[in-house]
Amino acid sequence: MARGGVPNFGGGNINNLMKQAQKFQQQMEEMQGQLENKKFQASVGGGAVTAIANGKKEIVDIRIKPEVVDPDDVEMLEDLILSACNEALKKAEHETANEMKKLTGGMNLPGMF
């Protein structure tokens, strides 16, 4: 056992661990910055409604083809908007999870994103 009664933390190992943690944190911040600037687009209804989300999982744009707007069927348009938004957010979440897996080597670190 290493000095201080803590196994595997003697000598320079703690310094190496701290350096690795700092490097990991820097890589995470870089990845977050890149993802925040990415756009994730989803279209539904044959392209009638398109939603665009960013890497912060915010809807930043919604596009609706004019021919889809029917004052007598507002509910259909609402459903299309919800579907497009949810799909764009799923794409952003999926990409974030994939990038996180690459960074962590597949380790699951809950609460990181």
Curated annotation (Swiss-Prot):
Signal peptide: none annotated. One of its GO terms (molecular function) is DNA binding. It is found in: Cytoplasm, Nucleoid. Keywords: Cytoplasm, DNA-binding. GO terms for cellular component: bacterial nucleoid; cytosol. NCBIfam families: DNA_YbaB_EbfC. Binds to DNA and alters its conformation. May be involved in regulation of gene expression, nucleoid organization and DNA protection. Belongs to the YbaB/EbfC family. Homodimer. This is Nucleoid-associated protein CTC_00074.
